[in-house]
């Protein structure tokens, strides 16, 4: 709370796509359930997603969306009750969560682009990145 009003969560991803490490250029909708779940679990209002690579990094701001978190909770509750056979309602909620994930991913804001730099290690010996 003293560092960031409303609390702050930091999630770090190290993407390795196509055999090459490269930072994300945007927040992907498929990340949204995890990111919003972290915000819900911690009660924080903001999450900074750091996408790191040895060639540079990006930082994105993701804000909590209580409606989305509620829909996720409803979908999870339906999965838990799946034996009751309410697949139609689960399908509706699943589609709603996927659609909202796209909206929230687009709303996420890139707050920093960090250029590559020399590897700095607090450990003795060579740097692990090379």
Task: Describe the role of every protein-language-model region.
Residues 1-130:
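Accessory terminal regions of nucleic-acid processing enzymes
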